[in-house]
A protein has these predicted regions:
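Conserved Nudix-box catalytic region and its N-terminal flanking loop in Nudix hydrolases
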Residues: 16-55
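A short coil-to-beta-strand element that immediately follows conserved catalytic motifs
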Residues: 59-68
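Conserved N-terminal beta-strand and adjoining loop/helix that marks the start
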Residues: 1-18, 38, 69
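NUDIX/MutT-family hydrolases
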Residues: 85, 94-125
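Structural detector for helix-capping/boundary residues
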Residues: 15, 37, 51, 64, ...
């Protein structure tokens, strides 16, 4: 079974959370996700998180604490996602490697079509905030 390790950013500003819509082609195309991407061989997860935010959205970020690690198995692939708390420190938000991005309130995240791993992560956030 192939194993892929990915980083994802939980970025919150003024009570709203940054979400990115995946490009239509590829796995989970068109779904909304916490922005991030695959760790390259030998790459540090925190470095990957910073690189992916710059590549996908044109922003620099402070990569903070690991919030959660979620594992899913789909089509003979295990995908492990490391969710980091991040804060934007520079750059200008742009949809570079995604269809679009938007800031949403916590209640709006429920209605978004998300990959299974992001849905699991968000369920954990809801429980933790109660």
């Amino acid at each position: 079974m192939e194993q892929i390790v990915v980083t994802a950013a939980f970025i919150r500003e003024d009570g709203r959370i940054l979400m990115a819509k995946r490009l239509p082609k590829g796995p989970e195309g068109g779904k909304w996700e916490f922005p991030g991407g695959k760790i390259e061989p030998g790459e540090d997860p925190r470095s990957c998180m910073g690189r992916e935010l710059l590549e996908e959205l044109g922003i620099q970020a402070e990569v903070g604490a690991v919030l959660e690690v979620v594992s899913t198995v789909k089509e003979l692939r295990q995908i492990i996602i490391i969710y980091f708390e991040c804060r934007i420190t520079g750059g200008e938000l742009q949809a570079i490697e995604c269809q679009q991005f938007k800031w949403v309130g916590p209640e709006e995240i429920e209605a978004l079509d998300k990959p299974e791993s992001d849905a699991k992560f968000w369920d954990g956030r809801k429980i933790a905030s109660k």
